[in-house]
A protein has these predicted regions:
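N-terminal Rossmann NAD(P)H-binding glycine-rich loop of SDR-like oxidoreductase domains
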Residues: 8-28
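NAD(P)H-binding glycine-rich loop region in Rossmannoid oxidoreductase-like domains
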Residues: 55-103, 107, 128-133
Length: 353
């Protein structure tokens, strides 16, 4: 059956995830607008057919003017779908998380409503991080080695974010829940990795230096999702029936221990040996506290801060993706082995490694 061309706006299009969403839409034959700031890099938004929409999510009046002009350029129409992938994962000041992730979401929704541009569906990219460190009491599961693991986080659990980032996303979700006649769907991916991603790339750099650093001695169960699986889920969420107002966890469906990712990186990079260092949590907390404080004084972003401490120290990152399978038809196709292989290949081909 021939696919009908749709109009799609992707905010945060210059970011890691956003650029993949734009590319996928173009490959599917849709009209895609890359929502960017005036200062945003467009390095990975160079595919033929890419249209740009400069949006100031921090200025509601200017944002309305920008949407009004775009609507005129589109012949008085809006977009069929809006994917809100814009967001801040690192900020110098806590308030910036809420200004970008919470208020930016509210400004966009209110501007779309005010300009009569409410889409058929609004896809909000949230995060598993809004739940924080819950379900961290190990439970015995019938596995061949009878090991202790944790139970997955469920949609019915109460979010208890342990990071400022997670709290800002939680508040954005809470705002969406107050809207009326606004067809939104929330996607909560676990850790997203893939080509062009910079945080997990730091692990690859560490492996290249023959060092793997881990923290905490209590067992850790981790989940991942390759960027293409997330993008596929986003496009499924656009047309899935009866999912308005609902939220879904997304991962590759597998559970990994704390060494699996680094072991695969070492394997794909061909490094003969790596020194695995494991430090206590109190040591990491001290390092993150000092680093975050000093960086704040200097007005610079820090890779290590208290948010990063809570992320690295969290033991349970499992989540239940069965609702996404059932309602969206989501099925992950990128297990960690395949995803890491593709990521390392890209890093090497593009001179990152």
């Amino acid at each position: 059956m021939e696919q009908i061309m749709k109009r799609i706006l992707v905010t945060g299009a210059s970011g890691f995830i956003g650029s993949f969403i734009v590319s996928e839409g173009l490959q599917r034959g849709h009209q895609v607008w890359a929502g960017v700031r005036g200062s945003s890099s467009r390095k990975y938004l160079n595919e033929p057919g890419t249209q740009f929409a400069e949006l100031d999510l921090g200025n509601p009046d200017k944002l309305r003017q920008q949407l009004r002009q775009l609507k005129e350029e589109m012949g008085g129409q809006g977009w069929d779908y809006v994917v809100h992938a814009a967001g801040a994962t690192k900020c110098i000041k806590k308030e910036q998380f809420f200004k970008t992730n919470t208020e930016g979401t509210r400004h966009l929704v209110e501007a779309l409503q005010a300009e009569d541009m409410v889409p058929q569906r609004f896809i909000f990219i949230s995060s598993l991080s809004i739940f924080g460190a819950i379900r961290e009491q190990p439970v015995r599961k019938a596995t061949p080695d009878n090991r202790w693991i944790y139970s997955p986080i469920l949609l019915t659990d109460t979010p208890q974010p342990n990071t400022v980032y997670g709290e800002s996303k939680k508040q954005a979700e809470a705002y969406l829940a107050t809207t009326k006649d606004f067809p939104y769907v929330i996607l909560r991916p676990t850790g997203v990795y893939g080509p062009r991603e910079k945080d997990y790339f730091l692990m690859a750099q560490s492996i290249k230096q023959h060092t793997d650093f881990a923290v905490g001695y209590k067992p850790q169960e981790i989940t991942f999702i390759y960027v293409q699986d997330l993008v596929d889920a986003i496009y499924l969420a656009m047309d899935a029936p009866g999912v308005e107002g609902k939220a879904y966890f997304l991962s590759d469906g597998e559970i990994y221990d704390s060494r699996r990712f680094s072991d695969l990186l070492q394997q794909e990079m061909g490094d003969p040996w790596v020194l695995h260092i494991k430090a206590p949590l109190w040591f990491l907390r001290a390092i993150c506290a000092v680093s975050g404080t000093v960086s704040g004084w200097m007005g610079k972003l820090s890779t290590l801060n208290l948010d990063k401490y809570h992320i690295l120290s969290q033991r349970n990152w499992q989540c239940d993706i069965e609702p996404a399978r059932r309602d969206l038809g989501y099925e992950p196709h990128w297990p960690l082995e395949r995803g890491v292989k593709a990521s390392v290949k890209w890093y090497k081909e593009n001179g990152w490694l």
